[in-house]
Amino acid sequence: MGKYFGTDGVRGVANRELTPELAFQIGRCGGYVLTKSAERPKVLIGRDTRISGHMLEGALVAGLLSIGAEVMRLGVISTPGVAYLTKALGAQAGIMISASHNPVQDNGIKFFGPDGFKLSDEQEAEIEALIDSAEDMLPRPIGAGLGQVNDYFEGGQKYLQYLKQTIDEEDFSGMKIALDCAHGATSSLATYLFADLDADVVTMGASPNGLNINEGVGSTHPEALAAFVKEKGADVGLAFDGDGDRLIAVDERGNIVDGDQIMYICAKYLKETGRLKQQTVVSTVMSNLGFYKALEAQGIKSVQTAVGDRYVVEEMKKNGYNLGGEQSGHIIFLDYNTTGDGMLTALQLVNIMKIKGKPLSELAGEMKKYPQLLVNVRVADKEKAMENEQVKKVIQEVEAEMNGNGRVLVRPSGTEPLVRIMAEAQTEEACRAYVERIADVVRREMGVE
C-alpha cells in the first residue's frame, strides 16, 4: 500500500483527508498516467449517493480536463457498472467515487484501466510520485487542447441491458423479490432491472438523501432485509452495499445467505452446465470450512488467497478461473465482469432458483456452515507474535486435536496492532475453547498490558 492508495483505491474522510485539492491532483496525475498514450483520451466517472460525491467529482473532472482528457459523467452508478462501461465504451480509464460500505463521511476514488480491471501497484506508485512531485511537469494544454465534459447518464441502462444477457431464464415472472439497496448506487438500477424481468419487486433502502447510505441497511446490515422478506412474503431478499459490488442474500424464511453459500450454489450450477473453468473456485482464507467440504462433495476444487477481492481477482486472472469471491459478498464472475458485482451475482442466484424450481433455503442448506468465532488480541508487535515459538506450538496442538474437523487461522491485522484468531469447529463450545486457548498464549507471550 502506498501513501494515498490503499487496498481499494484512495479513501478518507471527505473534505478533511480526501480534499477537493487532493482530488484535483488525483484526477490530473491519474488521468495522465492512464491516458498518456492516447491523443484525445476518454475517461468515465461514476459516483455513489454520498453528499460529498458532487464535490469530489467536480475536482476530479477539473484535473482531468486540465490535461486534455474528454470526460463522460455517468452520474450515480455502481462500481462494477463503471468497470464494465470503461471497457465496453473503449475508454482509457474509469473512475468510481465511493467508499463502498463505509460511513457517509468517508469517500474514496477508485481507478479502472482500459481493460476494466483495477490498477496495478506500479501504476498506483507512478500516480503517487506525480502527486508528490515538487514541480508539476504535466502537460498544460490551452484553447482547443483542453478537455470537455459530457453527461452519459444512459450508461446505467446500457449496463443493465448487458447484465440481462448473462442469464439463461427469459424472465423472473412468478417470483417475489425483496431488494435492499443500502440507499446507495443500486437504488434506481436494481429496482428497474428486476422489474424489467417481470419479477414482483418490493424495495427498501432505496431512498438516498446523500446522508443515509449504508445506515442500518444493505449487505452489512442484512437483518433489516430479513425482517422485510418475512413481512412481504418474498421468495428471496437481495442486499447490496453502498457501491453495489457486494451481495448478501436472505432466504424465504428470513435466514441470511452469505457469500460462501452463494458461491457454492453458483459453482455447483456452473459445474452442472459445463461452465466452471478448471472445476475450481477461488476464495479467501476467511471462507467457512463447510464451504470447502460442500465443494469437495461436488468434486469441485478450491484455491485460497489472502483476504481482499483484489487478491481473488489476481489469482483468477493468473490461472484462468472464472468464479471466485469472499464470504462478505464480493463475488466475481470473470466471464462477465472484471470486479465483484452485486447485481450480476443477484441475477445468477435468482436464475438458478428459477431453473431448479427450488427455494433458496434448500439450495443454501446443502452447505453446512461450521460455527466460526473470531477474536482480536492487541499485541505489542504483531509480526513477532506470529513467529513466537509458544504461539506456534499451541496452534499445532489445536490443529492436531481438530483432526480435519475444524480449522484455525491466526494472522496479523493489516491495519491495526492486533492478532486475529479465527477458529471453526463442529460446535460453538469447541470453537470458543480453541480460540480462547490460543488467545491466552498470545496474550501471555506478546500481549499489551
Curated annotation (Swiss-Prot):
Its EC number is 5.4.2.10. GO terms for biological process: carbohydrate metabolic process; peptidoglycan biosynthetic process; UDP-N-acetylglucosamine biosynthetic process. It comes from Geobacillus kaustophilus (strain HTA426). Pfam families: PGM_PMM_I, PGM_PMM_II, PGM_PMM_III, PGM_PMM_IV. Binds 1 Mg(2+) ion per subunit. It catalyses: alpha-D-glucosamine 1-phosphate = D-glucosamine 6-phosphate. The modification Phosphoserine is found at residue 100. Gene3D superfamilies: Alpha-D-Glucose-1,6-Bisphosphate, subunit A, domain 3, Alpha-D-phosphohexomutase, C-terminal domain. GO terms for molecular function: magnesium ion binding; phosphoglucosamine mutase activity; phosphomannomutase activity. Mg(2+) binds at residues 100, 241, 243, 245. One of its GO terms (cellular component) is cytosol. This is Phosphoglucosamine mutase. Keywords: Isomerase, Magnesium, Metal-binding, Phosphoprotein. The lineage of its organism: Bacteria, Bacillati, Bacillota, Bacilli, Bacillales. Catalyzes the conversion of glucosamine-6-phosphate to glucosamine-1-phosphate. InterPro entries: A-D-PHexomutase_a/b/a-I, A-D-PHexomutase_a/b/a-I/II/III, A-D-PHexomutase_a/b/a-II, A-D-PHexomutase_a/b/a-III, A-D-PHexomutase_C, A-D-PHexomutase_C_sf, A-D-PHexomutase_CS, Alpha-D-phosphohexomutase_SF. Belongs to the phosphohexose mutase family. Its cofactor is Mg(2+). SUPFAM superfamilies: Phosphoglucomutase, C-terminal domain, Phosphoglucomutase, first 3 domains. Activated by phosphorylation. The active site is at 100 (phosphoserine intermediate). PROSITE patterns: PGM_PMM (PS00710). Disulfide bonds: none annotated.
